[in-house]
């Protein structure tokens, strides 16, 4: 088990910058998830930690040792890729022990490590099977087991669940979470799926355009995003955004005007620092934080465009006539029977709102959310 430190790390190919000025501290035994859209540099960052990509600028430390020029095999890391990369002609036991055999580990010790890891991953009854006789989830566990038997100090996982169907992804998320708690190893996990990030991580690193957009615990990022990008990326369905104008500013609250027919004005409990009267901002509110109109002092009138009945919840896409933008999503943990074209009023609770400046940075929220 070891800590990982990245100090002003960058990667470029000629004049093209893939990652830039990455500063991260990953503690011993921590489960950290790198998340972001395709092309944001998350897999490149993981490969730099693994030693599969050279670091152009900055320094990488694993366990307080500078690793920039250390070979991958000597970094004390183990890596699981999106592809299982199992040898089809070898059984599970031989696949798991293959790396140990190449490293010259004696057979008795190889067998002992394989059996211990097989018990942890519930593979003991499959050790004599070939990969073709295994399910997708079992193959992924074998790939994880192959890494575990090498006893790495840092465990790297590059989108390991991407090839699995939805049900298996849920199952393997649970298995990986249990595995981390049991082993207490430092784990760094890459995914584009923010649901995986929210459910697995002790700490999430949100990446965008090769840089760090925000680092924090899952609920911190959900309730207190540092910028509009993080607010829109974390959460499913994603946050709604409405254009608003500032009409008054105080130290601990900002008054805004909605662009609807009634031009509603109301105060939002956020820091007024750096906000000016007349400024155009973005109001953010999550679909699950909208409420029935009778439960709020401020409401919006919308036209129902699409209704998604999911059994345990309903998601309604609304068009706000005065606002030319993508539809507003309203989510409730109940069955709501409405039809396309119906008028519907929804309520806004100021305490659950976010405000973002024109440059995308968030006004500091002052409402205390549970669990943060």
Curated annotation (Swiss-Prot):
Coiled coil: none annotated. Residues 4-234 form the ABC transporter domain. It catalyses: D-maltose(out) + ATP + H2O = D-maltose(in) + ADP + phosphate + H(+). This is Maltose/maltodextrin import ATP-binding protein MalK. InterPro entries: AAA+_ATPase (IPR003593), ABC_transporter-like_ATP-bd (IPR003439), ABC_transporter-like_CS (IPR017871), ABC_transpr_MalK-like (IPR015855), ABC_transpr_MalK/UgpC-like (IPR047641), Mo/tungstate-bd_C_term_dom (IPR008995), NA-bd_OB-fold (IPR012340), OB_MalK-like (IPR040582). Its main location: membrane. Belongs to the ABC transporter superfamily. Maltooligosaccharide importer (TC 3.A.1.1.1) family. It is found in: Cell inner membrane. One of its GO terms (molecular function) is ABC-type maltose transporter activity. Its EC number is 7.5.2.1.
């Amino acid at each position: 088990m070891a800590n990982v430190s990245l100090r002003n790390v960058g990667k470029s190919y000629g004049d093209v910058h893939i990652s830039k000025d990455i500063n991260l501290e990953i503690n011993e035994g921590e489960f950290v998830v790198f998340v972001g859209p395709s092309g944001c540099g998350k897999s490149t960052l993981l490969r730099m930690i693994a030693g599969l990509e050279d670091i152009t600028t900055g320094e990488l430390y694993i366990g307080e040792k500078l690793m920039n020029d250390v070979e991958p095999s000597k970094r004390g890391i183990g890596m699981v890729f999106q592809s299982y990369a199992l040898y089809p002609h070898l059984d599970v036991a031989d696949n798991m022990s293959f790396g140990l055999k190449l490293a010259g580990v004696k057979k008795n010790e190889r067998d002992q490590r394989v059996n211990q890891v097989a018990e942890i991953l519930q593979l003991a009854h499959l050790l004599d099977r070939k990969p073709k006789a295994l399910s997708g989830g079992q193959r992924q566990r074998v790939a994880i087991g192959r890494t575990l038997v090498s006893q790495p100090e840092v465990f790297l996982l590059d989108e390991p669940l991407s090839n699995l169907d939805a049900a298996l992804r849920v199952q393997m998320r649970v298995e990986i979470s249990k595995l981390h708690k049991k082993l207490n190893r430092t784990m760094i996990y890459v995914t584009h799926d923010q649901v995986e990030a929210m459910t697995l991580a002790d700490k999430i690193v949100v990446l965008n355009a090769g840089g760090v957009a925000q680092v924090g615990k899952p609920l911190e990022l959900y309730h207190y995003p540092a910028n509009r990008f993080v607010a829109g990326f974390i959460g499913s369905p994603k946050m709604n955004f409405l254009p608003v104008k500032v009409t008054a500013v105080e130290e601990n609250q900002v008054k805004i005007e909605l662009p609807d027919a009634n031009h509603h004005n109301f105060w939002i409990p956020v820091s007024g620092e750096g906000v000016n009267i007349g400024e155009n901002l973005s109001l953010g509110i999550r679909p699950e934080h909208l409420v029935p109109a009778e439960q709020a002092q401020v409401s919006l009138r919308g036209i129902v465009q699409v209704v998604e009945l999911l059994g345990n919840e309903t998601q309604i896409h609304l068009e706000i006539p005065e606002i030319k933008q993508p539809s507003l999503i309203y989510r409730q943990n109940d069955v709501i029977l409405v039809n396309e074209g119906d008028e519907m009023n929804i309520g806004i609770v100021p305490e659950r709102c976010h405000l973002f400046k024109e440059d995308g940075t968030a006004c500091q929220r002052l409402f205390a959310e549970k669990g943060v």
